[in-house]
Amino acid sequence: MFQISNLLIAADFSAEVANNSAVGMIGSFIAAALLIVVPATAFLIFVSQKDSLDRTSTGRR
């Protein structure tokens, strides 16, 4: 662990570069949530509700 910290200190990263990288990473997480997680969740809720209605109407016949 000590060698890794020395390597990072010796690389002389600026705070601006680290900040921009962190902002980009957070932006990627948000984009992934909007493009993948939200539509998948909506689809699963829709299918779940439809299946529940089908089972309810089938049981009453």
Swiss-Prot record:
It comes from Prochlorococcus marinus (strain AS9601). This is Photosystem II reaction center X protein. Keywords: Membrane, Photosynthesis, Photosystem II, Thylakoid, Transmembrane, Transmembrane helix. Belongs to the PsbX family. Type 2 subfamily. It is found in: Cellular thylakoid membrane. The chain crosses the membrane at residues 26-46. It is a single-pass membrane protein. The gene is psbX. It holds the Pfam family PsbX.
